[in-house]
UniProtKB/Swiss-Prot annotation:
Its main location: cytoplasm. Belongs to the class-II aminoacyl-tRNA synthetase family. PROSITE patterns: AA_TRNA_LIGASE_II (PS50862). Homodimer. CDD domains: HisRS-like_core, HisRS_anticodon. SUPFAM superfamilies: Class II aaRS ABD-related, Class II aaRS and biotin synthetases. It catalyses: tRNA(His) + L-histidine + ATP = L-histidyl-tRNA(His) + AMP + diphosphate + H(+). InterPro entries: aa-tRNA-synth_II, aa-tRNA-synth_II/BPL/LPL, Anticodon-bd, Anticodon-bd_dom_sf, His-tRNA-ligase, HisRS-like_core, HisRS/HisZ, HisRS_anticodon. One of its GO terms (molecular function) is ATP binding. This is Histidine--tRNA ligase.
Length: 425
């Protein structure tokens, strides 16, 4: 007997019972995005490897350890996208969308990182992100945060997430801070783990988000980035905080929040939760005003965020189980039995779909008695059953049963659509 082939570790199948929940959540996310004026963009899953090396940074964990990179048949190095901000910027430059223009886009799709699989962290994961190009004020940063806050309210998780904010300033400000931080770390090398020692010179800001408790204790005495901010970055951050205060959005300033990708500047933010254990970040983003120029475009201010869909769905399931409890596949189930009923049922089903194109109507196939077919209707979550037997076929009628109340009546087929609207409204 042949050995079963299974999914690659860390890459998951999402079955119909799962995708019902995904679709319900995605519908809310997309509706809110449309309400803020965002349009969808779709970019390739595979990009040239230099795109990510230049955008994310050569000495980041993503580039050094986590990318799925290989040579294609022409010997060109290509990479499965580990994130999609770089792809959106590349597409914007390539198609002339960014110069002297304002763009608001969103994307949703699979990303790939070679990480140790665990709850909420996978090697193939779905990410929804939003990017804004051409706007540089703190007001657009605030709007992005307000957009995400609206998601949390609609999903019933707002009270279980916390907004963390920081400003990492300009490139020059970070260079000055980096020099001070390295000098501090050099004095305390004996208290650093090997990973932090490696990062101390290559990417010292990443030491700030070390998960090592001893390192975190040491950092209590380290220089703080806020003391090195340039005047414009400080004004921008103060403006953002004032806007959020005015909008009633609570936040916590986290001086050690730096984000793991090199392209960020000024505003960085994360929505975090304690409800999922170690994997606490739900959504994260910030400004990346230099990235467009870095990838070959003209200087263009930009800001955005990304959110892991699997982690969001885990959080909604944990906090708001009622939201994901309903798994209705069909509104109406068409049961048929007896001679001639199958053909009549096919015709009736198409007529109803023509009249009510938004209706979810599932037709019984495979026979079965009346009781068994109604059992299938219940399993699919149907509220109404249409019953078509030999008598109904001969008379041109249909029995319609409200599965919630048990009430049943027989009507001419021409009146069925109107009655369904009444019962389901």
């Amino acid at each position: 007997m042949a050995k079963n082939i299974q999914a690659i570790r860390g890459m998951n199948d999402y079955l119909p019972a799962d995708t019902v929940i995904w679709q319900r959540i995605e519908t809310i996310l997309k509706r809110v995005l449309a309400g803020y004026g965002y349009s969808e963009i779709r970019t390739p899953i595979v990009e040239q490897t230099p795109l990510f090396r230049r955008a994310i940074g050569e000495v980041t964990d993503v580039v050094e350890k986590e990318m799925y990179t290989f040579d294609d048949r022409n010997g060109e190095s290509v990479t499965l996208r580990p994130e999609n901000t770089a792809g959106c910027v590349r597409a914007g430059i390539e198609h002339g969308l960014l110069y002297n223009q304002e763009q608001r886009v969103w994307y949703l799709g699979p990303m790939f990182r070679y990480e140790r699989p665990q709850k909420g962290r996978y090697r193939q994961f779905y990410q929804l992100g939003a990017e804004v190009f051409g706007l540089q004020g703190p007001d657009i940063d605030a709007e992005l945060i307000l957009l995400t806050a609206r998601w949390w309210r609609e999903l019933g998780i707002f009270e279980h997430v916390t907004l963390e904010l920081n400003s990492i300033g300009s490139l020059a400000a970070r260079a000055n801070y980096r020099e001070a931080l390295v000098a501090f770390l050099e004095q305390h090398q004996d208290k650093l783990d090997e990973d932090c020692k490696r990062r101390m010179y290559s990417n010292p800001l990443r030491v700030l988000d070390s998960k090592n408790p001893e390192v975190q204790q040491l950092l209590n005495d380290a220089p703080e980035l806020c003391d090195y901010l340039d005047a414009e970055s400080k004004e921008h951050f103060d403006g953002l905080c004032a806007l959020l205060d005015g909008a009633g959005i609570k936040y916590r300033i986290n001086q050690r929040l730096v984000r793991g990708l090199d392209y960020y500047n000024r505003t960085v933010f994360e929505w975090v939760t304690t409800a999922l254990g170690a994997q606490g970040t739900v959504c994260a983003g910030g400004r990346y005003d230099g990235l467009v120029e870095q990838l070959g475009g003209r200087p263009t201010p930009a800001v955005g965020f990304a959110m892991g869909m699997e982690r969001l769905i885990l959080l909604v399931q944990e906090i708001n189980p009622a939201f994901v409890a309903e798994r209705t596949v069909a509104d109406v189930y068409l049961a048929s039995f007896g001679e001639g009923s199958q053909q009549a049922a096919l015709i009736l089903a198409e007529q109803v779909r023509d009249t009510l194109p938004q209706l979810r109507l599932m037709m019984n196939h495979g026979g079965g008695n009346f009781k068994k077919q109604l059992g299938r209707a219940d399993k699919q979550g149907a509220k109404i059953a249409l019953i078509l037997g030999e008598d109904e076929v001969r008379s041109g009628q249909v029995a319609i049963k409200d599965l919630r109340t048990g009430e049943q009546q027989t009507l001419p087929q021409s009146e069925i659509a109107a009655r369904l609207v009444e019962l389901l409204s």
